[in-house]
């Protein structure tokens, strides 16, 4: 079985990306947010998602057999969405500082450590050219 985990930062598009991949016939979509696939898988692929990026996704052997898809989105739209959802009262976990740290962490593991099976997609590019960016990853 091939496992796929989608992560990024809240309101970057993890849910919609998981749904798009989950609609592929050979993919079993894990409905609830999780950072590890534990349930029985009946299809060739399984996809899960979590809105937050954690360093152990890259450094722990528990995720070494996962295809890791990191999704980013223009921070203007991320924080417009977060402000709307939280009535302009964003907590520390959803702060611009955490957004920046998330971007730095991904850059470190993808480009400095060169962790295999790690991919980057921009939310703004998902739908272009009949999902071409996503097809390039999968």
Question: What do these predicted regions represent?
Answer:
Residues 1-50:
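PAPS-dependent sulfotransferase catalytic core
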Residues 51-138:
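PAPS-dependent sulfotransferase catalytic domain
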């Amino acid at each position: 079985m091939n496992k796929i985990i989608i992560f990024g930062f809240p309101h970057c598009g993890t849910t919609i990306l998981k749904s798009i991949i989950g609609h592929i016939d050979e993919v079993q979509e894990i409905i609830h947010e999780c950072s590890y696939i534990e349930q029985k898988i009946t299809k060739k692929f399984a996809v899960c998602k979590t809105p937050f990026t954690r360093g152990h996704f890259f450094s722990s052997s528990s995720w070494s057999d996962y295809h890791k898809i990191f999704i980013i989105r223009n921070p203007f739209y991320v924080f417009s969405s977060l402000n709307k959802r939280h009535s302009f009262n964003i907590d520390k976990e959803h702060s611009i500082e955490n957004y920046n740290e998330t971007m730095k962490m991904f850059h470190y593991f993808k480009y400095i450590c060169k962790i295999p099976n790690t991919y980057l997609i921009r939310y703004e590019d998902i739908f272009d050219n009949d999902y071409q960016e996503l097809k390039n990853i999968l």
